[in-house]
Amino acid sequence: MNPNQKTITIGSVSLTIATVCFLMQIAILATTVTLHFKQHECDSPASNQVMPCEPIIIERNITEIVYLNNTTIEKEICPEVVEYRNWSKPQCQITGFAPFSKDNSIRLSAGGDIWVTREPYVSCDPGKCYQFALGQGTTLDNKHSNGTIHDRIPHRTLLMNELGVPFHLGTKQVCVAWSSSSCHDGKAWLHVCVTGDDRNATASFIYDGRLVDSIGSWSQNILRTQESECVCINGTCTVVMTDGSASGRADTRILFIKEGKIVHISPLSGSAQHIEECSCYPRYPDVRCICRDNWKGSNRPVIDINMEDYSIDSSYVCSGLVGDTPRNDDSSSNSNCRDPNNERGNPGVKGWAFDNGDDVWMGRTINKESRSGYETFKVIGGWSTPNSKSQVNRQVIVDNNNWSGYSGIFSVEGKSCINRCFYVELIRGRPQETRVWWTSNSIVVFCGTSGTYGTGSWPDGANINFMPI
């Protein structure tokens, strides 16, 4: 091969190699661009579709490093879009209740700065549970705690902490309120906060940390709400509110709220005669509430809320073992499912129950005269059969030698079912314990279990003689 041929051959080989390298670089570049922009293909609508102008909440944004031919490519995983809760799973089948949480607020107040509270409740977002209470604008070891037996003062605020964390000085004050309800729709918290003059109070609706709507008193007689969690289904939340006499005819309305904005108000209908302090739970696709009749009945009213057409029905729990306090002895108490039993209806106490097929699970004070002790049990046929009294699976939560108080329900969504849980308010101080001038509480919390369980009693536990006066 002469020199010219060698030169041509070497040049041809070099050109071929250069061309191959150039094509490889183009391929690598194309791969990089494709992977980088792949994220924009996630759930993208067709070109002829209109994208709704709604906010997207990014829950997490993860970056993965992928190595390809010594070239580093950053691939971003598609963000998850947070959805509204719909509570469509079935209710968990349980055998009873197991201990879940206890905050020991009063015992801790003997040596620390803990808020004076009452009207506690529990509610959960999709990942975590929180405890709420109405603070009195003071800690217990503080002269301002004198006279905190009073319910409605302008200094009361709604407090919010992770469940199990007592209300210390660093606790968030969510809103101004002497009556409240809170719930999470899957995207953000809704707080319903009532405060102001007894004859002209205001309910503020706070969503995602912002005031969105409000409503004034409609009967000029202590506008009030649940003192436990509201319920949201597919982005619409519902809360029961009453304005009017606490021991006579009152005006109860059911409000429907979308991202903090009132979208509909329905009047109470059905056979319930008086409604206070409802304990509500999701019963997909609707919501059910068990309330307090402070006028005519020691059997508890039931409100069924249709979340689609906003219709309302009401009745009473069928169980002849009634849930309110005061009440008749079990042997003489009655309920016909439709009407108040006209047995010691006033004053009453906030409580809860929930249906389980034809049966009903319920909780109540052990003492039929006052707010002491606490028990739970199931009544066979208690949801469907008038005056049913067959009791099973009874548990003592607080023995009858210790004070209890309000109680209410909250729901927790598991992997396969929705569990029902409840809290008990453990009131200390006045009016029962007159050595001190304050009134406050701690809480104990139980949740449904399909397992076995033991026995015990979980009272507040503070020695009143150790407490500040």
UniProtKB/Swiss-Prot annotation:
InterPro entries with a match to the protein in the record: Glyco_hydro_34 (IPR001860), Sialidase_Influenza_A/B (IPR033654), Sialidase_sf (IPR036278)
Enzyme's top EC category: hydrolase
Record region (Disordered): 325-349
Virion surface side, ranges: 30-469
Membrane topology: Single-pass type II membrane protein
Cofactor: Ca(2+)
Region (Head of neuraminidase): 91-469
Residues with attached carbohydrate: 61, 69-70, 86, 146, 200, 234, 402
Keyword Nucleotidyltransferase: no
Segments for region (Hypervariable stalk region): 36-88
Catalyzed reactions per annotation: Hydrolysis of alpha-(2->3)-, alpha-(2->6)-, alpha-(2->8)- glycosidic linkages of terminal sialic acid residues in oligosaccharides, glycoproteins, glycolipids, colominic acid and synthetic substrates
Transmembrane segments: 7-29
Domain of life: Viruses
Annotated GO biological process: carbohydrate metabolic process; viral budding from plasma membrane
Subcellular location: Virion membrane; Host apical cell membrane
Modification(s) after translation: N-glycosylated.
Enzyme Commission number(s): 3.2.1.18
UniProt-annotated stretches for the region Involved in apical transport and lipid raft association: 11-33
HAMAP family: INFV_NRAM
Subunit structure: Homotetramer.
Protein's job: Catalyzes the removal of terminal sialic acid residues from viral and cellular glycoconjugates. Cleaves off the terminal sialic acids on the glycosylated HA during virus budding to facilitate virus release. Additionally helps virus spread through the circulation by further removing sialic acids from the cell surface. These cleavages prevent self-aggregation and ensure the efficient spread of the progeny virus from cell to cell. Otherwise, infection would be limited to one round of replication.
Written domain comment of the UniProt record: Intact N-terminus is essential for virion morphogenesis. Possesses two apical sorting signals, one in the ectodomain, which is likely to be a glycan, and the other in the transmembrane domain. The transmembrane domain also plays a role in lipid raft association.
Family membership: Belongs to the glycosyl hydrolase 34 family.
Note: The influenza A genome consist of 8 RNA segments. Genetic variation of hemagglutinin and/or neuraminidase genes results in the emergence of new influenza strains. The mechanism of variation can be the result of point mutations or the result of genetic reassortment between segments of two different strains.
The protein's name: Neuraminidase
Organism: Influenza A virus (strain A/RI/5-/1957 H2N2)
Lineage: Viruses, Riboviria, Orthornavirae, Negarnaviricota, Polyploviricotina
Gene transcribed to yield this protein: NA
